[in-house]
Amino acid sequence: MPPKTRAAGVKKVRRKEKKNVAHGHAHIKSTFNNTIVSITDPSGNVISWASAGHVGFKGSRKSTPFAAQMAAENAARKAQEHGMRKVDVFVKGPGSGRETAIRSLQAAGLEVGAIQDVTPTPHNGCRPPKRRRV
């Protein structure tokens, strides 16, 4: 049996290298329960991400526009550390945090280029959930 070089239970951690990307894509997925913001380089590799739950909101507060604003600001701040200055925005989903997330990306200092809605629409695919009776 070969001798162990590392102590048991110690994991080798690779540091995140600083990518220098000036232009990228911001993908905002806004569902009824949460908002996820991912900022990628043009080829689709994720540079930074944040979600309403990751920022610290729980339960029904994750679906609010304010939670989406905080998530977008957090993701934009992380992306700016990697040299990001300009983004094209792709919005997906029916949630309430769509416009707020775009506005907060601009407020955080990123220059927003094109805004595109890429919400998937079914050609009569899965049956939707039943209507709520309150």
Curated annotation (Swiss-Prot):
NCBIfam families: PRK05309.1 (NF003698), uS11_bact (TIGR03632). It comes from the Bacteria. Gene3D superfamilies: Ribosomal protein S11. Pfam families: Ribosomal_S11 (PF00411). Keywords: Ribonucleoprotein, Ribosomal protein, RNA-binding, rRNA-binding. The keyword RNA-binding applies. This is Small ribosomal subunit protein uS11. The gene is rpsK. Located on the platform of the 30S subunit, it bridges several disparate RNA helices of the 16S rRNA. Forms part of the Shine-Dalgarno cleft in the 70S ribosome. Part of the 30S ribosomal subunit. Interacts with proteins S7 and S18. Binds to IF-3. Belongs to the universal ribosomal protein uS11 family. InterPro entries: Ribosomal_uS11, Ribosomal_uS11_bac-type, Ribosomal_uS11_CS, Ribosomal_uS11_sf. One of its GO terms (cellular component) is ribosome. GO terms for biological process: translation. GO terms for molecular function: rRNA binding; structural constituent of ribosome.
